From Swiss-Prot:
Pathway: Amino-acid biosynthesis; L-histidine biosynthesis; L-histidine from 5-phospho-alpha-D-ribose 1-diphosphate: step 2/9. Belongs to the PRA-PH family. The keyword Glycoprotein does not apply. Its EC number is 3.6.1.31. Signal peptide: none annotated. It holds the Pfam family PRA-PH. GO terms for molecular function: ATP binding; phosphoribosyl-ATP diphosphatase activity. It comes from Bacillus mycoides (strain KBAB4) (Bacillus weihenstephanensis). It is an enzyme of class 3 (hydrolase). GO terms for cellular component: cytoplasm. GO terms for biological process: L-histidine biosynthetic process. The keyword Hydrolase applies. This is Phosphoribosyl-ATP pyrophosphatase. Keywords: Amino-acid biosynthesis, ATP-binding, Cytoplasm, Histidine biosynthesis, Hydrolase, Nucleotide-binding. The gene is hisE.
Length: 107
């Protein structure tokens, strides 16, 4: 699984280094961080709607869009995917208590 995510991220980085005129990825880079963040917000909202509709197929599709746009943000910020994967590895297996987390007041 990690390999396909790595390939996606590498493709995004390649588009950043070597733009293609008709590339949606390059469109996002050309519009900048605010556009990328807006798309992440839109895609997260679509995940929520798909989940509320109990539409598993749509949840999967929208999650892929979230991953993609988050990867574009990482590339925009020059944050290597390896940094994120290392954080996942460090968090994996750690015990977490509900009391350790801040209460969510509003949505």
């Amino acid at each position: 699984m990690e390999d396909i995510l790595k390939l996606l991220f590498e493709t995004i980085e390649e588009r950043k280094k070597n733009p293609l005129s008709e590339s949606y990825t390059n469109y996002l880079f050309s519009k900048g961080e605010d556009k990328i963040l807006k798309k992440i917000g839109e895609e997260c909202t679509e995940v929520i709607i798909a989940s509320k509709n109990n539409d598993k197929e749509e949840i999967v599709k929208e999650m892929v869009d979230v991953f993609y746009h988050c990867f574009v943000l990482l590339a925009e910020k020059n944050i290597p995917l390896e940094d994120v994967m290392q954080e996942v590895k460090e968090r994996n297996g750690k015990l977490s208590r509900v009391g350790d987390r801040r209460e969510i007041d509003t949505l």
